[in-house]
C-alpha cells in the first residue's frame, strides 16, 4: 500500500506552542513530523532525567509514566488534527475525550526517545479518533486508541 503524501514535514516546538495550549511541565512532545494527508503523523518526545515526573516515579529506578505517554499521544493527535484542517477551519482548542484499548508493553527510561505514531481511525464533524503506537528504537512500548474534539 502506498503511503499518503506528506502535508507538513516537521512541526517544531515553536509551532507546537502556537498550536496547543499546553506549557511546561505538561507539554509532552518536542516536535511532530511527517503529517500526512491521511491524518497520520509522528510525535517525538526526548525523555530527560531532569523532568519533574522522575522525582517520584521512581527515584531509585526512573521509569517514564505510562499516563504521560498517553497524553503525548493525545497531544500528537491534536497537532495532526489542527494542522490538517488549517486553512479550512480554525479550531481554538482540542479536548482529549476517550482512551480505549490501552496497553503498556515496555518501560521507557531517561535518555530514550519516544515516537508517537498516530493515525486517524475515524472522524465525525468535530470528533476525531486516532490509533497510536508509542515506539522506542522501533519497538512498541505502549499503544492506545484516543478520541478528541476540536472546538472553534
From Swiss-Prot:
Keywords: Cytoplasm, Lipid A biosynthesis, Lipid biosynthesis, Lipid metabolism, Lyase. One of its GO terms (molecular function) is (3R)-hydroxyacyl-[acyl-carrier-protein] dehydratase activity. Signal peptide: none annotated. It comes from the Bacteria. Its main location: cytoplasm. Pfam families: FabA (PF07977). GO terms for biological process: fatty acid biosynthetic process; lipid A biosynthetic process. The active site is at 57. It catalyses: a (3R)-hydroxyacyl-[ACP] = a (2E)-enoyl-[ACP] + H2O. SUPFAM superfamilies: Thioesterase/thiol ester dehydrase-isomerase. It is found in: Cytoplasm. InterPro entries: FabA_FabZ (IPR013114), FabZ (IPR010084), HotDog_dom_sf (IPR029069). Its EC number is 4.2.1.59. GO terms for cellular component: cytoplasm; membrane. Belongs to the thioester dehydratase family. FabZ subfamily. Involved in unsaturated fatty acids biosynthesis. Catalyzes the dehydration of short chain beta-hydroxyacyl-ACPs and long chain saturated and unsaturated beta-hydroxyacyl-ACPs. This is 3-hydroxyacyl-[acyl-carrier-protein] dehydratase FabZ. The gene is fabZ.
Amino acid at each position: 500500500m502506498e503511503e499518503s503524501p506528506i502535508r507538513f514535514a516537521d512541526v517544531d516546538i515553536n509551532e507546537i506552542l502556537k498550536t496547543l495550549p499546553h506549557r511546561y511541565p505538561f507539554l509532552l512532545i518536542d516536535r511532530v513530523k511527517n503529517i500526512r494527508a491521511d491524518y497520520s503523523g509522528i510525535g517525538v518526545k526526548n525523555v530527560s532525567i531532569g523532568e519533574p515526573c522522575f522525582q517520584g516515579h521512581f527515584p531509585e529506578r526512573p521509569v517514564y509514566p505510562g499516563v504521560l505517554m498517553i497524553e503525548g499521544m493525545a497531544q500528537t493527535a491534536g497537532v495532526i488534527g489542527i494542522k490538517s484542517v488549517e486553512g479550512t477551519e480554525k479550531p481554538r482548542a482540542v479536548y482529549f475525550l476517550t482512551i480505549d484499548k490501552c496497553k503498556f508493553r515496555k518501560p521507557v527510561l531517561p535518555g530514550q526517545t519516544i515516537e508517537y505514531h498516530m493515525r486517524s481511525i475515524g472522524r465525525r464533524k468535530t470528533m476525531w479518533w486516532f490509533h497510536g503506537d508509542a515506539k522506542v528504537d522501533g519497538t512498541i512500548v505502549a499503544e492506545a486508541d484516543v478520541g478528541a474534539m476540536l472546538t472553534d
